[in-house]
Amino acid sequence: PLHWVFANLNASKDTIRILADLNKAYPFAETDAEKLEQKALGEINQDIIQRAIDCMSEGRVEDLGKLMNEAQEVFDKYVAPNCPSQLKSPKLHATLADPKILELTYGGKGVGSQGDGSIQFLAKNEECQKALVNYLNANNMPAYKLTIQPKHTIRKAIIPVAGFGTRLYPETRFLKKDFFPVVDKDNQVKPVILVLIEEC
């Protein structure tokens, strides 16, 4: 399971200013700093997202937490310099570096446009998740938890194909119901039995 914790830092930030400053890099970057911002929010971000998807699908929770830390480092290095008045984020960084929080989590990062608004963590387990929520609430940072359980995968499925398909009569006089052609989500015509198997 993924034991997430989200919290409001209860500090101030100006989202409109952040977005206005960061949007200066689009659609065409004019300075080196703007080019780095585009790279960070583009190809580097895409790479981190793909690795995060891989971590989740393979159950590598600790590595997912490290990716959160990496994403925050990339943001701080390449994006934050384009809006220093709002993205120095002292409370965010103090919270991310809190020794008590580091004991309870695999990683953490800011949320959305960043700044001293909200924060998210990946707790090590359910007990750490509860302790982290209590700790953040006690420090005037309202927190809530979200646990995502692993998806149950189907290893075996029974697909009944017996019977005459009376609701499809008279077509079933010429073609068994399990071989009826259907158009799948990719706009390919396949026998209905194949579509059922692919869905399993």
Give the location of each predicted region.
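C-terminal nucleotide
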Residues: 1-110, 120-150
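Short, flexible coil/turn micro-motifs enriched in small/turn-prone residues
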Residues: 107-112, 158-160
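Conserved glycine-rich beta-strand-loop-beta hairpin in the small C-terminal domain of fold type I
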Residues: 117
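N-terminal glycine-rich phosphate-binding loop and ensuing alpha1 helix
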Residues: 151-200
